[in-house]
Structures are given as C-alpha cells and as structure tokens.
C-alpha cells in the first residue's frame, strides 16, 4: 500500500497544472488550448469566480492560451493560477500565483508585451505596411526590442527556469529576425520600389546565433523563423554563386530544403512544425503520409513529435 501511494504521489507531482478564475468575460465557454499540442486542451462553462483547473502531462515548456488570446507559460511540473479580469472584450488585468519560476516568467512575458505597446511595435508585418512604417524604422525598433527584452530577462535569469527564458527570448528574436528578412522586401514590393535586396539587406542577419535549446524549440514562432531563415540562406548562397533562386512553394520542396539546411534538434523541430501545419491545414493530407515516414526514418529525434504526427494522421 505504501509503495502504491508513493507511486501515485510521484505521478501526480509530475503533472503540469493550469487553473484560472475569470471575471467580466462575455462568452459562454472558457477555453484552454496548448500551443505545442492540439491534444492538450480543455473547456469550461463560464462561471465568474469559479476555479477552472486542468492538469496534463508535459515534457517541455508549454504555452497555454486562454480564450484564444491570453498566454500562460509553464515548465513541466509547474502549477500556476491566473486571475483574469475583462473590461468588455479587453483584458484589464492578469495576476499570477503559484510556482515561483512560472510566476516570474509569466510576469516577464507580460512586461515584454508592455514594452511592445510602449514602443508601438506591431506583431503583424501587414499592420506595419498598412501604417506605412518605413523599413528603417522597423529594423531600428526590432533591434531596440531585442536589447530591451535581453535586459529585462537578465534580471530574472537566476530565478526561473532557463527553458522559460529561452522561450521568451526565442519569440522576440523570431519577430525581430523575420522583420529583418521580410519587411524590407514586402515594403519595396508594395510601394513598387527598387529591389530591397542590396548589400545592407544581406548584412542584417550577420552574427545571428541560432538557438537549439528545448525552450527555444518549443516556441512555434521561432520554428517558423527557422523555416524562413533556411530559405533566406539558400537564396543568399545562390546569389553569391551567380545563380537564380526560387523559394520553395510546395510542401515537399519546403521539407527537402529544411532537411538539407539544418541538423539535429533544429532540423527535427522545424520539420515537425512544417508537417504539423500541413496536416492541420486539412488539404490533401494524404501527401503528408510519405513525408512523415521519411521524417521518422531519417530525422526524428524527439519521439513526442512523431507520436503527435501519428495522432494527427488518424
């Protein structure tokens, strides 16, 4: 009996738990959705003051989204409680209690969003185009954002899980680096200006160090950046060799390009994200079957990825 009880307690201790109280929300249902897995999710009937609690197994940093817009970051085994107050459709406040490392990380993530608001730093590049933000301004602001976030996270780096720090840093870097690669070109094409791909453009990504930690590779935005960066490097190499370049525009060609461009955990995670996105798009899913088999045979390291892909194909 003692052994069984100890085993039960041990298993329960490994659970990751999110609980929430929500006030002022006008919807009928409360939704918890996991960024990393479509199979980690819960829903509850709206009842102001009631604690909505959900426990799940996690092996890596996990970002849960409440009601499609409020992010909560957890390490495996963390337990965190959040009180969210709405004013109409807008979130008035989010207050965290629970595991110290998770609370610190989530407060830091809130501060990052506040920095963006203060800087008027838009998350969507199409919004920048609509507001006629000049490429020079976007690049300057992206560099400032990177510096501000690094400074902020340095203050808590010894007090929270490194993987959560890496997750937040990776998300910020993804936004900045994608801006470097895409916004000058988008702006020039929209305004019918000469090509933006001069020497200064290719220098923007010089000195970038790619991340391969669990925290960074758990961040979907960072994996999206890795995919885009693979094509950026291929184009740069082609131009340096005097060759034309056409960015891959089919699922299979993207898969081949990314598989060639990376190694190890970075390749594993980027390919997983590409395949996962294709399957979840629901279009010609049968095309994913041979690709998944090739991925499992040649590139898969994180077995959670292959298991999730198999579930998605069922």
Locations of regions flagged by a protein language model:
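Bacterial Sec-dependent N-terminal signal peptides
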Residues: 1-19
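Eukaryotic, compositionally biased intrinsically disordered regions
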Residues: 10, 16, 26, 30, ...
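A non-transmembrane, solvent-exposed segment enriched in polar/low-complexity residues
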Residues: 14-160
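Flexible helix-coil transition and linker loops at the boundaries of alpha-helical arrays
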Residues: 152-168, 213-215, 256-263
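Extended amphipathic alpha-helical segments with heptad-repeat/coiled-coil character used for oligomerization
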Residues: 169-237
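Alpha-helical repeat scaffolds
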Residues: 188-207, 247-258, 284-296
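Generic helix N-cap/helix-start motif at coil->alpha-helix transitions
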Residues: 265-272
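N-proximal helix/coil linker or "cap" segments that precede and/or mark the start of modular domains
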Residues: 276, 280-314
């Amino acid at each position: 009996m003692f052994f069984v009880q100890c085993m039960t307690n041990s298993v329960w201790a490994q659970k990751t738990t999110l609980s929430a109280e929500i006030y002022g929300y006008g919807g009928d249902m409360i939704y918890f959705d996991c960024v990393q897995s479509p199979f980690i999710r819960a829903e509850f009937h709206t009842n102001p003051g009631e604690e909505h609690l959900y426990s799940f197994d996690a092996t890596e940093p996990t970002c849960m989204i409440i009601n499609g817009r409020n992010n909560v970051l957890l390490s495996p085994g963390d337990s965190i409680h959040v009180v969210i107050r709405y004013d109409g459709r807008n979130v008035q406040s989010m207050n965290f209690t629970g595991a110290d490392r998770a609370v610190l990380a989530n407060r830091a993530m809130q501060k990052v969003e506040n920095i963006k608001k203060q800087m008027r730093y838009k998350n969507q590049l199409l919004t920048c185009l609509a507001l006629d933000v000049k490429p020079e301004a976007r690049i300057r602001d992206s560099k400032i954002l990177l510096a501000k976030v690094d400074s902020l996270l340095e203050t808590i780096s010894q007090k929270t899980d490194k993987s959560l720090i890496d997750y937040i840093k990776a998300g910020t870097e993804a936004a900045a680096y994608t801006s470097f690669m895409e916004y000058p070109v988008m702006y020039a094409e929209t305004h019918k200006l000469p090509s933006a791909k001069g020497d200064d453009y290719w220098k923007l990504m010089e000195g970038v160090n790619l991340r391969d930690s669990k925290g960074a590779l758990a961040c979907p935005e960072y994996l999206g950046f890795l995919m885009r960066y693979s094509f950026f490097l291929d184009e740069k190499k082609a131009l340096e060799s005097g060759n034309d370049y056409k960015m891959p525009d089919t699922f299979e060609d993207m898969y081949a390009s990314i598989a060639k461009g990376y190694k190890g955990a970075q390749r594993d995670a980027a390919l997983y994200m590409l395949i996962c996105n294709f399957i979840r798009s629901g279009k010609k899913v049968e095309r994913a079957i041979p690709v998944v088999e090739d991925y499992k045979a040649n590139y898969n390291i994180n077995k959670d990825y292959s298991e999730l892909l198999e579930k998605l194909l069922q």
